[in-house]
């Protein structure tokens, strides 16, 4: 019998997710000295308006318009922090980095392993009766989507492999909800107010184990306007309007990752793990 992924139950997966980014905790010193924002208006239209500290973003799309935000991880080095404390401008040479298995209590190590199993969570506030909210996650250059119709609450989950399923959600018209879209263990899931939204069939996009073990991230540096799925810009939030304007605010935005398993043969210097 071929090997299969041992998938975590929803409540276990939620408990094990690790925070990569939280918009509620900006770094004012970096912002003041020109460090790039983790979230960028990807269509370069200016439709997303950030609150001053970039804890939340608001957009109003006219009929037929769309607005997209994308996340990129810009990781300041110790030298960057030194320059910031000296009042020097930083950020012009900042480059997006992969999400890795960094742990704060192992801070001597910056994390050596790319993690493609990600989740995006936010408080979604709708001031409109219709429109569409689309979340996407990139994993090894494969882009997975969750599209929520504000008119009737139907969520459509679409894996890059073509597997599709629908879920009925309480997200309808005007209101506020906590939404989380996850791609963990090669399975897509949607949670609203911490409750899983069941689909008729699981959205599994199984990769073969032997291929999964050698799959690499896509390292193309992309900029606003690009449609290339890159692991250097792995999370997106898009608002689409059809026949009427749509006004939406997203706040408390978090990017999360699954824990990362490695086979280790021992330890080197403190905080360092050697892989098999």
Predicted regions and their residues:
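Extended hydrophobic leader/signal-anchor segments used for secretion and membrane insertion
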Residues: 1-276
């Amino acid at each position: 019998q071929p090997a299969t992924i041992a998938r975590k139950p929803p409540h276990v997966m939620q408990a094990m997710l690790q925070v990569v980014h939280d918009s509620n905790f900006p770094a004012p010193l970096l912002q003041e000295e020109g460090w790039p924002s983790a979230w960028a208006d990807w269509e370069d239209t200016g439709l997303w308006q950030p609150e001053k500290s970039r804890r939340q973003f608001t957009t109003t799309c006219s009929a037929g318009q769309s607005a997209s935000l994308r996340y990129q991880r810009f990781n300041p080095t110790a030298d960057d922090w030194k320059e910031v404390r000296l009042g020097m401008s930083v950020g012009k040479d900042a480059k997006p980095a992969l999400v890795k298995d960094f742990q704060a209590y192992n801070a001597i190590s910056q994390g050596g392993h790319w993690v493609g199993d990600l989740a995006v969570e936010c408080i979604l506030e709708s001031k409109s009766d219709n429109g569409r909210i689309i979340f996407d996650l990139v994993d090894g250059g494969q882009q997975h989507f969750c599209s929520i119709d504000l008119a009737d609450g139907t969520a459509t989950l679409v894996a890059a492999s073509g597997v599709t399923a629908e879920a009925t959600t309480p997200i309808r018209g005007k209101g506020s909800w906590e939404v989380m879209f996850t791609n963990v263990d090669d399975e897509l899931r949607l949670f609203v107010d911490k409750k899983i939204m069941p689909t008729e069939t699981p959205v599994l996009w199984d990769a073969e184990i032997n291929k999964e073990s050698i799959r690499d991230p896509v390292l193309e540096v992309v900029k606003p306007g690009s449609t290339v799925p890159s692991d250097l810009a792995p999370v997106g939030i898009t608002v689409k309007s059809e026949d009427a304007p749509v006004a939406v605010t997203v706040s408390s935005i978090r990017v999360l990752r699954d824990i990362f398993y490695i086979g280790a043969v021992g330890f080197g210097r403190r905080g360092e793990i050697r892989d098999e």
